[in-house]
Amino acid sequence: MAQRTGLEDPERYLFVDRAVIYNPATQADWTAKKLVWIPSERHGFEAASIKEERGDEVMVELAENGKKAMVNKDDIQKMNPPKFSKVEDMAELTCLNEASVLHNLKDRYYSGLIYTYSGLFCVVINPYKNLPIYSENIIEMYRGKKRHEMPPHIYAISESAYRCMLQDREDQSILCTGESGAGKTENTKKVIQYLAHVASSHKGRKDHNIPGELERQLLQANPILESFGNAKTVKNDNSSRFGKFIRINFDVTGYIVGANIETYLLEKSRAVRQAKDERTFHIFYQLLSGAGEHLKSDLLLEGFNNYRFLSNGYIPIPGQQDKDNFQETMEAMHIMGFSHEEILSMLKVVSSVLQFGNISFKKERNTDQASMPENTVAQKLCHLLGMNVMEFTRAILTPRIKVGRDYVQKAQTKEQADFAVEALAKATYERLFRWLVHRINKALDRTKRQGASFIGILDIAGFEIFELNSFEQLCINYTNEKLQQLFNHTMFILEQEEYQREGIEWNFIDFGLDLQPCIDLIERPANPPGVLALLDEECWFPKATDKTFVEKLVQEQGSHSKFQKPRQLKDKADFCIIHYAGKVDYKADEWLMKNMDPLNDNVATLLHQSSDRFVAELWKDVDRIVGLDQVTGMTETAFGSAYKTKKGMFRTVGQLYKESLTKLMATLRNTNPNFVRCIIPNHEKRAGKLDPHLVLDQLRCNGVLEGIRICRQGFPNRIVFQEFRQRYEILTPNAIPKGFMDGKQACERMIRALELDPNLYRIGQSKIFFRAGVLAHLEEERDLKITDIIIFFQAVCRGYLARKAFAKKQQQLSALKVLQRNCAAYLKLRHWQWWRVFTKVKPLLQVTRQEEELQAKDEELLKVKEKQTKVEGELEEMERKHQQLLEEKNILAEQLQAETELFAEAEEMRARLAAKKQELEEILHDLESRVEEEEERNQILQNEKKKMQAHIQDLEEQLDEEEGARQKLQLEKVTAEAKIKKMEEEVLLLEDQNSKFIKEKKLMEDRIAECSSQLAEEEEKAKNLAKIRNKQEVMISDLEERLKKEEKTRQELEKAKRKLDGETTDLQDQIAELQAQVDELKVQLTKKEEELQGALARGDDETLHKNNALKVARELQAQIAELQEDFESEKASRNKAEKQKRDLSEELEALKTELEDTLDTTAAQQELRTKREQEVAELKKALEDETKNHEAQIQDMRQRHATALEELSEQLEQAKRFKANLEKNKQGLETDNKELACEVKVLQQVKAESEHKRKKLDAQVQELHAKVSEGDRLRVELAEKANKLQNELDNVSTLLEEAEKKGIKFAKDAAGLESQLQDTQELLQEETRQKLNLSSRIRQLEEEKNSLQEQQEEEEEARKNLEKQVLALQSQLADTKKKVDDDLGTIESLEEAKKKLLKDVEALSQRLEEKVLAYDKLEKTKNRLQQELDDLTVDLDHQRQIVSNLEKKQKKFDQLLAEEKGISARYAEERDRAEAEAREKETKALSLARALEEALEAKEEFERQNKQLRADMEDLMSSKDDVGKNVHELEKSKRALEQQVEEMRTQLEELEDELQATEDAKLRLEVNMQAMKAQFERDLQTRDEQNEEKKRLLLKQVRELEAELEDERKQRALAVASKKKMEIDLKDLEAQIEAANKARDEVIKQLRKLQAQMKDYQRELEEARASRDEIFAQSKESEKKLKSLEAEILQLQEELASSERARRHAEQERDELADEIANSASGKSALLDEKRRLEARIAQLEEELEEEQSNMELLNDRFRKTTLQVDTLNTELAAERSAAQKSDNARQQLERQNKELKAKLQELEGAVKSKFKATISALEAKIGQLEEQLEQEAKERAAANKLVRRTEKKLKEIFMQVEDERRHADQYKEQMEKANARMKQLKRQLEEAEEEATRANASRRKLQRELDDATEANEGLSREVSTLKNRLRRGGPISFSSSRSGRRQLHIEGASLELSDDDTESKTSDVNDTQPPQSE
């Protein structure tokens, strides 16, 4: 801040006297005493000096009284140097700690400086007195200033928010937070005052009659709201008892357009009772004190002590008068627009609230019923509110309540009546306050839609801690908790998240300031519920009380960290909450009632029906009482928009307040917050007193220290790349190369050029971040740069003005000398006799000469008149012919328009065909989906088949059980052993088969690999697929045969037959459905034919792009025609005829080409139509073939099913026979079954497991069948999709070729038009150049002759000045060399100091490590040392920055020194040259003086002759031989044009409508141009305003630069003294740095002066040289021109003849061009033929595509014909590929032809341009009279250029569409790749299926062998049974042992053995032991 002396009274409270602070004595005292801060109970912290260190304790001496004390090291806090005393931003403090912050705030507060910056926000301490710092003069001081330019103030915060809103277009908010009485409301008013003054809407507006009405109303809204919403409390005389959010809306220009006020939680209970020494709302006291007698009688007012609701009577406020405040409130209402009736009605309601309190009730003797002994007060109340007294008393004492469906009268007790009256009084006052806010908003918010952005000012009740706190205090403290959480989140969380989001190096710091636990304790809805949720829950229960609420709260939240039971006031308080500002004890009396807020329905209804309209309006929403929102769709009432809640939903006060607070927080989060932290200095409301402990508590709670720390450690300043480059590129002029560069790269280059320390900045993803102060330093550098530029500009301007004045003086001096010489000569000559004779004879000679000249002129005049009449006749004839040509041109244009319409129709038809094609593709997709549905049905049939097989397996199990029952024990043993051996053999066989299958699998894999390679080759694919198909069919047939054999031996045929019958019926239904689908396809085919006809009509939509381009071309042609018509309106007939003829010929050629194109396109469309009809016929044929194939497939399926039925019937008969035999055997073997039951069970388990495995294998076999068929189907589908995609790619490629051809054509048309425009522009430029050259030459001749002598004298004086300046420069250079040597010495000393500082930093780090190892106070020591380390690193960075800046300045100084040396040498050379030139000029001066006199006389004579000759030349130019030239030319052009018109007239008769369309398009373009022009003007206006604002700011900054530079120099000199031990050495360094800085500044100033002088001398020398050269050149040119003027008359005839020859040559060249264009047209016809051939090929490809689509319908039956379709599709795909290859070759050939034609066209255009230039150069001398016309034409040419640019834009759009088509092609390629991937997946599935098939075959063979063994064993057993029976019959009774021994016979390898019983048992046990492994 600049140093100020003799400060005025207001500035004493803003600015700090830095002279006192920078006192060297205080600095030395601080250094010597080693001052620190120690804790103090009284002062918070006290200053002391360290005397002795004793381990962890330190002996200190208090600075105030000299006492000594021992203090722990951890309790000591460092003291800042004296220069930081009363610092404006506490982030600048080197030692940041609580003591330093408190000391700084205290010093500033005692000096009257109440505002202090604390990093990113502002701290304000309530002064408790009025300060003169809020006047309009102070506002003007802060207006438009940046934050660092002015001292801290609420106005600076407001200005910053206002500027950010305008620049960033982001909504702002200013949040004034703090405890009650801290000054939030006053600061809010000052913010509104500043914004109303700065953004006044009447400034710059037209209506000056109502100046600032909106601003006045905005300022007067606060007094009204304070009267009705503020009250005196113990802590604050003007405490806001409600919260408000004031939203001020601004328009785009920054003017206020309206405002809106939202209020929160009015403390309405204050209206009925107040605490001790407190007052109710101000309006009650103001009304009773300030109302007049008449008003008192109207309002029935009484004294203060007569009202019960004024609990404490009248309590005055010191320094305020209620009477005066009442008048101010009334005046504010009038300004706000309140009517007299509204004010009176409001005051009546206020009086009625007081009257409510005076109503007294009495308890009757025998009952508890209340009564009203006296109704005088009730009468007054009813009179004021417009109610009936009887009804009111009845409603209070015996209200009607609803019981069921009926209403009954209920008597009230005295307590209930008193409560009802108080509730009515509170509700009435609350509704009055809501109406007041709504009325103010209605007055302020007059323009809702104009507000572009807003600034919100939040003034809400501050944090309150009373002795006992109620529900209102809980809501207020809850709000402040949320606001503090928003502050913490914004300052600490979001700031660091942005660092991480931008990717810069940053370690996340947790400051431990999260207030969410306390907020959750209050607002959490559940798990566990918070205070508000529990309160709402208790309101639902009828028997709930405040005590039950407290009990539930303790039960739910008793363990919460922020919840405690009260300790001090255990009897009075109920619970305690730990807020961020401290512990608060709450008493829950009447909380349920306050939350529910019940009201008497009867009285509310009476108030709603009041005779007073105002009262009735207040109670309009009577349905919302008792907290029950029963109205869902309420309209806007007097209180604004109604609450829209669900019907019947219970709404408590807590819920409503929570919702409004949530909305407020959402609004604040969407704005950019600006925080103002208000601090209360003491609770006594005394000025000049500051309680340090109170302030410290508030600073800790508000997070001030943390905010300062993150501001210092972080990167608070950030700027986006583009803005940084735009603003600071002036500092690095050559760092960024020309052209486009990424913003990040540009910023990196700029940073490198600025040579900033890497620690001072970070580069993120989209922004560049700086530490505090770096951006301000860059701003200063930028201001210095701009100052240098402005100084240089001023010097140039002053030098120019001085030279101009000097030249004028020199001119006057030479004129005086000439007059003197002439007078002296005349005085000598006048008495000479011969002179007298000469003067008498000379006039006579001149008279005779004049007569001769007049005769000659008369003759010439007659000749010229004759020529003029002749030329006029020719002109009329040419104009008549020109009109004919124009008519013919119009006819041709109409014909062209009709032809283009035909072409448009053809293009639309083509578009419709394309749309039809798209529809057919959609139909194809539908058919594919139906095919998929059929596949699903087939899958269902397969599932049913599986079910049948499961039933068959069940039958087989039953059959196995019967067989097992018949088998005997011995045979089972034999068979089991045989099975084991056979299984071992089968395992070997299976291994062999497995190896074979592996080999086959490898072969299959090789074949599949071959298939994938053959897919790329496309021709060999069909053969490989056929091989794979045959092998798969063989495998499938083998599987089916084996399955049938098993089914023959296992199935129970009766059930199978029924199942198969059902299956046949299902198949027949399926065949019927397929037949129906065929019929549907036939119907769809007919629909396709109809849609194809519609598609032909829709095909024309594709020509829209071409029509647009043609329209643009026609618009350009119309512009050219208008320009030519402007030419024709002038008199220069010959030039007009020539240009018109060229334009007409070019237009005819363009019309010819367009006509041929349109004819070709119509023929092509006809051919397309015929081809479409052929395609439809082929589709019909393909459909018929498909139906035939389908019928054949159905017949084949029927035959196969018949054979299957026959085989099943045979199997059924065999099974029946077999079953009969088994039943016979069953009866004989039942007895044997009982004996063998135990062994049979074991065997049955083994059998069951094997059968279960067999079932699984059968199911796997069936799944494999399905997978194989599915794989075949998918393979076919993929092949078909590949073909389809290839066809689509071909079609897209053809479409792309057509689009490219169209683009080439449009580009040619645009190029032709551009060439025409360029030709005309070149004509204009050359003509204007000739005109300017002629005029400048004439002026130069006159000026140069006059300035010769003046320049000679100037050069002599300049030479003398140069000699003097060179001598001065040499002396100054010697001085600068000495100063440079001195600076080098100072820099070396600085480097030594830097090294010492680094050593000190290392020592400090060692000390830090030692401190960390301390045992007892680890945490405290670590934190303190961390803070010290941060401060030291900041200081070290600062020192490094200073040293780097000095090094940069030294480099710059060296560069300047080298430049000065070069400049001095250059000036020495120039001095020598100037001396030589001066000597030469002296010799030439005398001869030039003589020549000048002669030239002046000759000049006058030649000027007369020149004028005469010019007149003659102009007449000749306009008339000479025009007739003879033009007649022949026009006749020839007429014949050619008539012939062309006759040829084209028959073809161009239908083009009339196109002309009207072009005119409409022209009108639309003009309208668009006007709109764009208006928008551009508006943008220019806003940009100019911004530039003016920036210019004003720059001028202010330039004026303040010197003072700021002085401050910066002092700060840099003092910054070195950061370390105590280095103070003595650093003082010497400071002196050296100051001396070096002063010397450097002097050197820089001298160098700048020398540079400016050098540049002036250079410019003067250059001007002298240039003027000398120009004099010589002009003298020579004047001589040449004098000679050429004599020869010009003779050359006129020759030029006319040459122009005639040039015209004939131009006509010949035009004929040649016409022939060349005709040849190019023939070439174009060949191109069109090639195009037709390609279109025919495209049609053929489309036919093939439709054939492929028809093939897709053949996929319904995929079981037998999949491989056939694969073969056919592969062959078709190969054919398509070959056809596509051919079409690609043809396309490449066409492209080569196009390139050749383009080259030819370019050659033709170059030839045309060269010939046109030749004709133009021949005719250049004839265009003198058309200068004014050509200027007008230049403007029209500019318009034509705009049209050309539009055409280019449209061409770009066409190219974009082409790119879209290419993207579609890429998408098709991706689909193709996906299809290939799907093919590979199917191959893998096929391999897995083959493996499963091998496993199934092995298991099937195994089962078959087991079945054979079982049947053999069964037969053997039956034989043994028969033999045993025979023995029994023969042998008679046999003993049991013998029979047992006889039965135990084993058959092993064909031999029988007889075993004993013991052996048998042992064998049985062996068998049992060996069986379990088998079952496993």
Swiss-Prot record:
The keyword Repressor does not apply. Gene3D superfamilies: 1.10.10.820, 1.10.287.1490, 1.20.5.340, 1.20.5.4820, 1.20.58.530, 6.10.250.2420, Kinesin motor domain (3.40.850.10), Myosin S1 fragment, N-terminal (2.30.30.360). ATP binds at residues 178-185. Residues 845-1976 form a coiled coil. The modification Phosphoserine is found at residues 1145, 1935, 1937-1939, 1952, 1956, 1975. Residues 786-815 form the IQ domain. The modification Omega-N-methylarginine is found at residues 18, 1930, 1940. Residues 661-683 are annotated as: Actin-binding. Keywords: Acetylation, Actin-binding, ATP-binding, Calmodulin-binding, Cell adhesion, Cell projection, Cell shape, Coiled coil, Methylation, Motor protein, Myosin, Nucleotide-binding, Phosphoprotein. It is found in: Cell projection, Lamellipodium. Residues 1125-1175, 1697-1718, 1874-1976 are annotated as: Disordered. The rodlike tail sequence is highly repetitive, showing cycles of a 28-residue repeat pattern composed of 4 heptapeptides, characteristic for alpha-helical coiled coils. Involved with LARP6 in the stabilization of type I collagen mRNAs for CO1A1 and CO1A2. During cell spreading, plays an important role in cytoskeleton reorganization, focal contacts formation (in the central part but not the margins of spreading cells), and lamellipodial extension; this function is mechanically antagonized by MYH9. Cellular myosin that appears to play a role in cytokinesis, cell shape, and specialized functions such as secretion and capping. This is Myosin-10. It comes from Mus musculus. The gene is Myh10.
